[in-house]
């Protein structure tokens, strides 16, 4: 396993330049191969004062690759296994230990699935390469895509595809899966892809349907949206005053969650209309660093196509 197997980090220059302001603890909650962390550490070297980079990933392969990539930085980085929804319990001990009382000044989340995971058939993330129906970001996780495809009832599958895939053919696909598995369990990504393609009334739309169904399964397997909501709450709580929170999202479901959370933190609560209060019931807790989400440039998209749908939002805690 080598860090070169991992994708070029998306919006790296923009996210790092907007995130890093003052020395302190910086958290890369989606370490992957260490691309963003490398840029963060290089930027932190230009600041006067002690800093510590904490990298979090639930994939042991990613931790191994990032460890090689960031080896030159020694004890200025700490890499820990876990998902970013556990950020509070993972980072708080470091604030008292290796962090030596440093404040948390930045938290970065890149919510995309790594190209290494997608391109590794054994991980079961892609319909383009046949492999076991797995999709676990944590290889030791309890739930696989095969468990869902072969175990959920038709109504539950349809609901899942509508909710997490926003797939209009969700009910039709669910029926096709239940029919197919009645003969034998679906165990590979290729078998599932064949069932989905056959169920699509228009073959020119099959790729979009495949993408949405696989997205829905991946989100369910890894509880991605629940983990994100937990990480937003706990990550913001960890930040010191002046600390910044940057999130790169790739699809509307996760971006809506981030947008709603950031809007709540940057808005004051003035209570019901008509109260005419002199001061808000609850003041804003943060300010927007960028008013509109940043997107990749045409140059970056041509160089790194997976950046096409990326959106970067950043707030600063008051």
Swiss-Prot record:
Keywords: Cytoplasm, Methyltransferase, rRNA processing, S-adenosyl-L-methionine, Transferase. Its main location: cytoplasm. It catalyses: cytidine(1402) in 16S rRNA + S-adenosyl-L-methionine = N(4)-methylcytidine(1402) in 16S rRNA + S-adenosyl-L-homocysteine + H(+). It is found in: Cytoplasm. GO terms for biological process: rRNA base methylation. GO terms for molecular function: rRNA (cytosine-N4-)-methyltransferase activity. One of its GO terms (cellular component) is cytoplasm. InterPro entries: RsmH, SAM-dep_MeTrfase_MraW_recog, SAM-dependent_MTases_sf. S-adenosyl-L-methionine binds at residues 34-36, 57, 84, 110, 117. It comes from the Bacteria. Signal peptide: none annotated. Specifically methylates the N4 position of cytidine in position 1402 (C1402) of 16S rRNA. Belongs to the methyltransferase superfamily. RsmH family. This is Ribosomal RNA small subunit methyltransferase H.
């Amino acid at each position: 396993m080598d860090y070169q197997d991992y994708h070029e980090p998306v919006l790296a220059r923009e996210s790092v330049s907007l995130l890093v302001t003052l020395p302190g603890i910086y958290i890369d909650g989606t370490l992957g191969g260490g691309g963003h962390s490398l840029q963060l550490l290089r930027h932190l070297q230009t600041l006067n004062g002690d800093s510590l980079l904490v990298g979090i990933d639930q994939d042991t392969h990613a931790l191994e690759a990032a460890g090689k990539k960031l080896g030159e930085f020694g004890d200025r980085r700490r890499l820990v296994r876990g998902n970013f929804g556990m950020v509070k319990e993972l980072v708080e001990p470091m604030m008292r230990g290796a962090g030596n009382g440093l404040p948390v000044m930045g938290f970065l989340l890149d919510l995309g699935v790594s190209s290494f995971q997608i391109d590794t058939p054994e991980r079961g993330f892609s319909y383009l390469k046949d492999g076991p129906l797995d999709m676990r970001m944590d290889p030791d996780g309890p739930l696989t895509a095969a468990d869902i495809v072969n175990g959920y009832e038709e109504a539950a599958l349809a609901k899942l595809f509508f909710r997490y895939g926003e797939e209009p053919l969700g009910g039709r696909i669910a029926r096709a899966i239940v029919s197919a598995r009645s003969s034998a369990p679906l165990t590979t990504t290729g078998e599932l892809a064949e069932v989905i393609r056959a169920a699509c009334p228009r073959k020119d739309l099959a790729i979009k349907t495949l993408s949405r169904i696989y997205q829905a399964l991946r989100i369910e397997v890894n509880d991605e949206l629940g983990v994100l909501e937990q990480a937003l709450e706990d990550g913001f709580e960890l930040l010191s005053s002046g600390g910044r929170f940057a999130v790169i999202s790739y699809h509307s479901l996760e971006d809506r969650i981030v947008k709603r959370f950031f809007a709540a933190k940057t808005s004051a609560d003035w209570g019901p209309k008509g109260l005419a209060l002199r001061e808000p019931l609850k003041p804003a807790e943060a300010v927007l660093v960028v008013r509109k989400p940043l997107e990749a440039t045409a140059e970056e998209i041509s160089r790194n196509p997976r950046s096409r749908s990326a959106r970067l939002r950043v707030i600063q805690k008051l």
